[in-house]
UniProtKB/Swiss-Prot annotation:
Naturally occurring in which organism (per UniProt): Marchantia polymorpha
Taxonomy of the source species: Eukaryota, Viridiplantae, Streptophyta, Embryophyta, Marchantiophyta
Record carries keyword Transmembrane helix: yes
Subunit field text: The 4 large subunits of the cytochrome b6-f complex are cytochrome b6, subunit IV (17 kDa polypeptide, PetD), cytochrome f and the Rieske protein, while the 4 small subunits are PetG, PetL, PetM and PetN. The complex functions as a dimer.
Family affiliation: Belongs to the PetL family.
Any one GO CC term of the record: cytochrome b6f complex
GO biological process: photosynthesis
Descriptive protein name: Cytochrome b6-f complex subunit 6
Keywords from the named record: Chloroplast, Electron transport, Membrane, Photosynthesis, Plastid, Thylakoid, Transmembrane, Transmembrane helix, Transport
Gene this protein is translated from: petL
Transmembrane segments: 4-24
Compartment(s) where it occurs, according to its Swiss-Prot or TrEMBL record: Plastid, Chloroplast thylakoid membrane
Length: 31
């Protein structure tokens, strides 16, 4: 049970980081 929760949190963190990097790259390209 604990491993599933930690894996889920890791997945959310990875998706959030990817989203932030994607938005940052788009802002750099727009400028």
């Amino acid at each position: 049970m604990l491993t599933i929760i930690s894996y889920f949190l890791f997945l959310i963190g990875a998706l959030t980081l990817a989203l932030v990097l994607f938005i940052g790259l788009n802002k750099i390209q727009l400028i």
